Amino acid sequence: MFFSRNSFVNHKKISYICSVNSKLKPWRRTREFTLFIMYRIFISHSWSYSSDYDKIESFLRQEGIAFYNHSVPKNDPIHTNGTDKQLSDAIEAKVKGCSCVIILAGVYATYSKWINKEIEMAKKYSKPIIAVQPWGAEHTSNVVKNAADVIVGWNAKSVANAVRNYAINQSL
């Protein structure tokens, strides 16, 4: 994931007031600081459905969410040359360090051999699970819906609001 100035355009502003010098006049005693929230997000995905994965990333950027992508990248050699154990360990390390897990609640999720493991890992480390219902999907995965802390629709605003409301506050 790359970071640019544009990542911080629509940041969440939090103001803190602190005492600078008690001898100053009251209106000069305070200073306001703005913090930028950076989320660590694991987006569960099947590389067969990588366009949905890309769309989730674009939803987050579109809504001004500054985030570090904790997902295991497609070009990681573990995907092609590694064992299931190595991939499982890589996913667990990524989930352990994230603020929240986003899972597409499409029917394919029910048949993915990794979804249950990712859900189990998220629960093990008390990571909130955000389920996103794919646009126009008639059927969704009960496995994902039952594990989710929140289920949102297929649009940028609802995905971004879920991240803001459910992600665990962590610093990079």
Predicted regions and their residues:
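Short, positively charged and aromatic/hydrophobic N-terminal segments
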Residues: Y16-I17, K23
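Conserved N-terminal substructure of TIR/SEFIR domains
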Residues: L24-G97, L172
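Conserved TIR/SEFIR loop-to-helix hotspot centered on a Trp-containing motif
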Residues: V107-K124
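A short helix->loop->beta-strand "cap" motif at the edges of active sites that frequently abuts
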Residues: Y125-V132
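Glycine-rich, charge-decorated loop segments at or immediately adjacent to ligand/cofactor-binding or catalytic sites
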Residues: G136-I151
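A charged, well-structured terminal subsegment
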Residues: A160-L172
